[in-house]
Amino acid sequence: MSRLLFVFALSICLLPVSAKASAVESLKAFVNKALTFRADFSQTLLDKNFQVVKKASGSMMFERPGKFRWVYDQPYQQLIVGDGKQVWFYDQDLAQVTVHRLDQTLGSTPAALLAGGNTIERDFNLQEIDVQGETEWLEAIPKNQENAFELIRLGFSQTGMLREMILRDSFDQVTWLIFSGTEQNPVLTPDLFQFTPPEGVDVISD
């Protein structure tokens, strides 16, 4: 395991609870003020022993409530689009589109979680975590036991910009997202949150 991943794994287990309220305030401000958002991301999936399973990268954007576009560029091309009612998963290599209702996916993807409305305090138990470097950490534990993730951690800069996101699922796999080139409240055109399946692909729906 690399030194970076070792430090990351240690932080997952040992980050102490802090008395500060800055991360919660940053989250509330982000939810209430970031009506649109855009960023590039790198994503690392780790198994329960914190060994790297896969890495990916791409770009993402959202418009509250419930509209988002999540694009994987590497190592494969995949597109996830939420149009406010449905979520479209397009795997270009498989030539396959899967469609789900938005309310069925709100807790199952990072994109849907970030693009949700201002109900986070209703849906999650929030707990402060100590500052690491220049990043203020917050832990959110879903109140709904059927959520795809058991634990979510959000890292904000001291100016309140989202920097990192960590999600642990029921198999103790960890998804680690690092955001860069972030823009809060950019102008996003409606067509970015619309999707029409390409001709000839298989479409699987609920």
From Swiss-Prot:
<keyword id="KW-0813">Transport</keyword>
<feature type="signal peptide">
    <location>
        <begin position="1"/>
        <end position="23"/>
    </location>
</feature>
<dbReference type="GO" id="GO:0044874">
    <property type="term" value="P:lipoprotein localization to outer membrane"/>
</dbReference>
<keyword id="KW-0732">Signal</keyword>
<dbReference type="Pfam" id="PF03548">
    <property type="entry name" value="LolA"/>
</dbReference>
<comment type="function">
    <text>Participates in the translocation of lipoproteins from the inner membrane to the outer membrane. Only forms a complex with a lipoprotein if the residue after the N-terminal Cys is not an aspartate (The Asp acts as a targeting signal to indicate that the lipoprotein should stay in the inner membrane).</text>
</comment>
<dbReference type="GO" id="GO:0042953">
    <property type="term" value="P:lipoprotein transport"/>
</dbReference>
<dbReference type="InterPro" id="IPR029046">
    <property type="entry name" value="LolA/LolB/LppX"/>
</dbReference>
<comment type="subunit">
    <text>Monomer.</text>
</comment>
<keyword id="KW-0653">Protein transport</keyword>
<dbReference type="GO" id="GO:0042597">
    <property type="term" value="C:periplasmic space"/>
</dbReference>
<keyword id="KW-0574">Periplasm</keyword>
<keyword id="KW-0143">Chaperone</keyword>
<dbReference type="InterPro" id="IPR018323">
    <property type="entry name" value="OM_lipoprot_carrier_LolA_Pbac"/>
</dbReference>
<comment type="similarity">
    <text>Belongs to the LolA family.</text>
</comment>
<dbReference type="InterPro" id="IPR004564">
    <property type="entry name" value="OM_lipoprot_carrier_LolA-like"/>
</dbReference>
<protein>
    <recommendedName>
        <fullName>Outer-membrane lipoprotein carrier protein</fullName>
    </recommendedName>
</protein>
